[in-house]
């Protein structure tokens, strides 16, 4: 029978000092011997997705203590990718994932916690905590802050839905008046919560449901809705159940590595492809899999991308649907239910909400469940009132959206497309693969041949786009922005937004060893691996080169001869210490970022640390 980890610091005369300190935190005499549950919160006033989380730890703690545990809360950092975007701050976003992961490990192991509740929400916080949870392999449950309500405003006598990307595009589009741009800006992000489309934060929170690590509704229930309160309370109760199962009954199925196993990662990626999730999820799932010692790779993602249809289309891929609409249609459980009926998921996977995913779907999939409480749960809707407060409204749709033919979530035979929402491309320019969010690409652009317009940084690319250098038919190449080369693998939302603002969103392609915001749409191909700084072919592309992209064939090719490519590689290597470095780029890189770059791997490995460099 596993012994409580916390006994290390609470039992025995030699731990008198530790117990004295525990007492100073509020632990009572009769508390010693109870499991200590760590609550990793990520409250910050910098991020709208986290601004309302301050009191969430107390909610979870109360439920834990009622169930017989000791709850101890700590905080992690949280970077807002939208605020950090478009300047040097974005260099810190992806590296913060590793910092969050390490900080959770440090706190949990330093204090010998027995189990963990992760209160996350935005882009790097959920994956960072997930990496830590799988590294630690103690009972865990995730509960996020929830999505933001979609923005709404009236323009040209028409009510339209909005999100962050609309504000960015309008702000860069000279055709939009100052008045309209300001109106869009003021309306785009009306409430607390993670940005309202299927961007990275919401994608990752949805994937925790498919991995079996969070409760139904975690990814879709609005941050503002009163019903979300119960998710936090239930998370506290469930973590105590998982803790009891493991420590008192030696039930290893309660551990995250047995829940989030290979089949669960396949389920998560299948969901991601079906809902057209952010391409960043690929990066984070690969990283989490490595922490959990799960052999899940780009090859598995490529295989699944050829099998899974696109069942749910959400902003930024369409202006019609946002996360509030996904929730009304049954949320993640609704999508998983359709995938299950299509025979595309492993329904025997363990899940924190029940014995198996099949059991969970029987209750929570509105297409098969007649439970009135479940239908009421998914009827929770927006209020349309600006607020930074959680649980501030209790509005409901008149009915759930159970239309699986023409609704937000569809049956396989009525899918938005039989091709899924994400695809892996490979070729001589990306030998180890790259990622495109096909959900956001017009079908007319699934094959594209263009002339390379090469930039050594995102800043130069932005200047080139806004300065008129980029024209229809160009393939914008932004390199040396990978995990090592940036360092930090910046998101390229501004270049893609500016292409749209110049009317080039469907007339150009963009490829990069950097990554894209979940808000990106258009023919935007990221995660090119190996990256330029690691000797990847993208570092050898020259302006004017012909680049051929074929999504149906899963191909991306630099159309030069092998002889010419070899000659360019030799010339690059001859540059000595300056080889595989951006020519003429001036960028201030802090010591912290340099340390990150030393161990960073390319995107096909999840941009995790190269641990071989740490071996004796």
From Swiss-Prot:
Cofactor note: Binds 1 [2Fe-2S] cluster per subunit. This cluster acts as a Lewis acid cofactor.
Name under which the protein is recorded: Dihydroxy-acid dehydratase
Catalytic activity: (2R)-2,3-dihydroxy-3-methylbutanoate = 3-methyl-2-oxobutanoate + H2O; (2R,3R)-2,3-dihydroxy-3-methylpentanoate = (S)-3-methyl-2-oxopentanoate + H2O
CC per GO annotation: cytosol
Domain of life: Bacteria
Record-annotated disulphide pairs: none
Modified residues (N6-carboxylysine): 124
Alphabetized GO MF terms: 2 iron, 2 sulfur cluster binding; dihydroxy-acid dehydratase activity; magnesium ion binding
General function of this protein: Functions in the biosynthesis of branched-chain amino acids. Catalyzes the dehydration of (2R,3R)-2,3-dihydroxy-3-methylpentanoate (2,3-dihydroxy-3-methylvalerate) into 2-oxo-3-methylpentanoate (2-oxo-3-methylvalerate) and of (2R)-2,3-dihydroxy-3-methylbutanoate (2,3-dihydroxyisovalerate) into 2-oxo-3-methylbutanoate (2-oxoisovalerate), the penultimate precursor to L-isoleucine and L-valine, respectively.
Pathway: Amino-acid biosynthesis; L-isoleucine biosynthesis; L-isoleucine from 2-oxobutanoate: step 3/4; Amino-acid biosynthesis; L-valine biosynthesis; L-valine from pyruvate: step 3/4
Alphabetical list of HAMAP family matching this protein: IlvD
Stored PROSITE patterns: ILVD_EDD_1 (PS00886), ILVD_EDD_2 (PS00887)
Active site, per annotation: 517 (proton acceptor)
Annotated source species: Shewanella sediminis (strain HAW-EB3)
PANTHER family documented for this protein: D-XYLONATE DEHYDRATASE, D-XYLONATE DEHYDRATASE YAGF-RELATED
Record note on quaternary structure: Homodimer.
Gene Ontology biological process: isoleucine biosynthetic process; L-valine biosynthetic process
Record keywords, A-Z: 2Fe-2S, Amino-acid biosynthesis, Branched-chain amino acid biosynthesis, Iron, Iron-sulfur, Lyase, Magnesium, Metal-binding
The family this protein is said to belong to: Belongs to the IlvD/Edd family.
Keyword presence, Metal-binding: yes
EC numbers, comma separated: 4.2.1.9
Protein residues bound to [2Fe-2S] cluster: 122, 195
Ranges annotated as spanning the membrane: none
Cofactor: [2Fe-2S] cluster; Mg(2+)
